[in-house]
Amino acid sequence: MKSLILVAAGGAIGASLRYLLGAGVYRLTGGPTGFPVAIMMANVLGSIAMGFFVVWAAHRGLTHLSPFVMTGVLGGFTTFSAFSLETVTLFERGEIWQAGLYVALSVGLSVFGLMAGLWVARGVYL
C-alpha cells in the first residue's frame, strides 16, 4: 500500500511537471507549433533522468525510491522513459533482436491501438 501511495504522489508530481513544461513551451513559442515539442522534450528529459536515476540509485543504495521516482514521477512526466530503459536493458544484455522487436511492436501496436480507439469511438459517437 505504501508503494502505491508513493507511485500516486510521484505520478501527480510528474504529470504536473509535464503540464508546466507544455505551458512553458506554449508561452515561449506563442502557441501551437504543429510539432509536439513539449512532449518530445518531456520524453527526452524523462529518459535522461531515468538513465541517471538507475545508476545513481544503485550506487547510493537508494533503489527503494524507484517506485516514487521511476514509476511515479518519471512515469507521470513521460511513459517514454520506461520504454527507453527497457529497450536499452535488452541491448545491454545483447538481446538485439528482442530490443528491435520490442521497439517495433511497441511503437507500431501503440499507434495502431490509438487508431483502433479512434475508429471505435468515431463509430459510436459520430
Curated annotation (Swiss-Prot):
Intrachain disulfide bonds: none
Alphabetized UniProt keyword annotations: Cell inner membrane, Cell membrane, Ion channel, Ion transport, Membrane, Metal-binding, Sodium, Transmembrane, Transmembrane helix, Transport
Catalytic activity of the protein: fluoride(in) = fluoride(out)
HAMAP family according to UniProt: FluC
Species: Roseobacter denitrificans (strain ATCC 33942 / OCh 114) (Erythrobacter sp. (strain OCh 114))
InterPro entries for this protein: FluC (IPR003691)
Membrane topology, as annotated: Multi-pass membrane protein
Protein name: Fluoride-specific ion channel FluC
Binding site for Na(+): G75, T78
GO CC field: plasma membrane
Family membership: Belongs to the fluoride channel Fluc/FEX (TC 1.A.43) family.
Regulation: Na(+) is not transported, but it plays an essential structural role and its presence is essential for fluoride channel function.
Entry GO MF terms: fluoride channel activity; metal ion binding
Known role: Fluoride-specific ion channel. Important for reducing fluoride concentration in the cell, thus reducing its toxicity.
Localization: Cell inner membrane
GO terms (BP aspect): cellular detoxification of fluoride
Coiled coil: none
Annotated transmembrane regions: 5-25, 37-57, 65-85, 101-121
